[in-house]
């Protein structure tokens, strides 16, 4: 209430690399030094299904555990450290995976109780602050492994691009923000259509008359389904 905010630290050790315990130890140390409650959780990569990439699996499991910690710590909001470069990498990764219009918007800065406050800042801007105030940090050694698609995009696509155009990160991020606005505008009209033409049935089922859905463009039909199944955005 008011300005009295209680901050907790959460760290998910993905156990994907041999030295991941170093990150865990660093976070634990920072929590102790600052006197902040720290919640550490472990992932078990052996539980990943064979038809799922390690990146997608780890991401899904991280957010799942963060949601559990949110409840356990009696918190209201999850804050993550994603910055503008992460956003651009996400957009390019989504393009490669044919996610369509929704993927072009990238990550949402606010998604229910999940907030990404650092999205407006590039990695370079944040590193300058870290250097200025001598803030300790650790690098994820797996960031150099090109077998991960995001790392390949960062090292082989985005980094050379930045050398040729130092505004490219801002340009792609701004385009992503524009696509996100287009998406929200479309969703507004899709919701109007749903309110007028969709009937709720029992057991989570819905009814849409064929004559109404057939009037919509192909993309709008897809969006109706996505809105109804709550599968929009990240």
What are these model-predicted stretches?
Residues 1, 8-12, 43, 47, ...:
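AMP-forming adenylation/ATP pyrophosphatase catalytic core
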Residues 1-159:
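Core alpha/beta nucleotide-donor-binding catalytic domains of modification enzymes
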Residues 3, 34, 73, 164, ...:
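Solvent-exposed amphipathic alpha-helical surface segments
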Residues 136-138, 166-172, 186-188:
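Short, structured loop/turn "capping" segments at alpha-beta junctions
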Residues 143-151, 169-180:
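Internal, active-site/partner-interface "lid" segment
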Residues 154-172:
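Conserved anion/nucleotide-ligand pocket segment
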């Amino acid at each position: 209430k008011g300005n009295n905010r209680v901050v907790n630290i959460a760290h998910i050790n993905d156990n994907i690399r041999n030295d991941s315990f170093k990150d865990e130890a660093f976070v634990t140390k920072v929590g102790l030094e600052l006197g902040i409650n720290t919640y550490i959780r472990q992932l078990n990569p052996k539980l990943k299904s064979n038809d799922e990439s390690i990146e997608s699996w780890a991401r899904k499991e991280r957010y799942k555990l963060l949601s559990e910690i949110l409840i356990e710590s009696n918190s209201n909001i999850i804050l993550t450290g994603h910055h503008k470069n992460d956003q651009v990498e996400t957009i390019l990764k989504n393009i490669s995976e044919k996610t369509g219009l929704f993927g072009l918007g990238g990550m949402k800065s606010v998604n229910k109780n999940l907030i990404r406050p650092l999205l407006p800042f590039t990695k370079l801007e944040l590193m300058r602050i870290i250097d200025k105030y001598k803030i300790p940090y650790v690098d994820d050694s797996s960031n150099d492994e090109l077998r991960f698609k995001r790392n390949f995009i960062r090292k082989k696509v985005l980094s050379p691009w930045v050398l040729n155009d130092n505004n490219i990160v801002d340009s792609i991020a701004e385009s992503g923000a524009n696509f996100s606005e287009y998406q929200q505008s479309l969703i507004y009209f899709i919701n109007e259509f749903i309110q007028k033409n969709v009937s709720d049935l029992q057991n989570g089922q819905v009814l849409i008359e064929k004559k109404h859905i057939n009037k919509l463009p192909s993309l709008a039909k897809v969006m109706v389904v996505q809105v109804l199944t709550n599968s929009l955005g990240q």
